[in-house]
């Protein structure tokens, strides 16, 4: 089974209209660009990040660790204008939703998506650019096969 950040990255890179909208600049902190290189990515761009996981028992009476992890990955959209950020964010949401539906139709194993959150639109004076982040959360079972290729 693919990790959440890989699913998001693959979904975004598979869509030709989104790739065209950002000039092919869809990168991942896990595969291509480190956090220090994010400031040097030309605009507009999309940066996919693996934001880690959390394992928490349902109650204090449970074991200290359960088989389920809550995994988080994000899509950061950077652009020159707020309007462009919003347009690309909407495209990202549509693309990811369609990609996951297609994976389910093909009976591919995917993590159980729990929620989607969005940050507020913000200004980064150091880059400089406007940006917004979509954060996807899912539940995975640590007993499932998560080996990397």
Residue ranges of model-derived segments:
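Short, charged, surface-exposed interaction patches
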Residues: 39-67, 111-130
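Acidic-leaning, charged glycine-interspersed low-complexity segments
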Residues: 94-149
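Small/polar-rich, solvent-exposed N-terminal microdomains that initiate assembly or binding
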Residues: 1-62, 147-149
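Residue-level signal for secondary-structure boundary sites
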Residues: 56, 83-85, 142-146
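Oligomerization/assembly interface segments of phage tail-like spikes and tubes
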Residues: 66-83, 129-141
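Extracellular/virion structural assembly segments
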Residues: 78-98
């Amino acid at each position: 089974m693919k990790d959440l950040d890989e699913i998001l990255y693959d979904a975004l890179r598979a869509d030709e209209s989104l790739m065209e909208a950002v000039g092919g600049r869809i990168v991942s902190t896990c595969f291509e660009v480190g956090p220090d290189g994010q400031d040097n990515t030309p605009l507009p761009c999309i940066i996919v990040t693996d934001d880690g996981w959390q394992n928490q028992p349902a109650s204090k009476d449970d074991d200290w660790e359960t088989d389920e992890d809550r995994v988080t990955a994000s899509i950061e959209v950077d652009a020159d204008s707020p309007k462009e950020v919003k347009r690309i964010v909407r495209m990202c949401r549509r693309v990811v939703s369609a990609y996951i539906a297609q994976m389910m139709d093909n009976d591919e194993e995917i993590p159980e998506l729990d929620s989607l959150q969005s940050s507020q639109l913000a200004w980064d004076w150091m880059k400089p650019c406007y940006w917004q982040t979509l954060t996807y959360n899912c539940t995975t079972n640590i007993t499932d096969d998560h080996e990397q290729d």
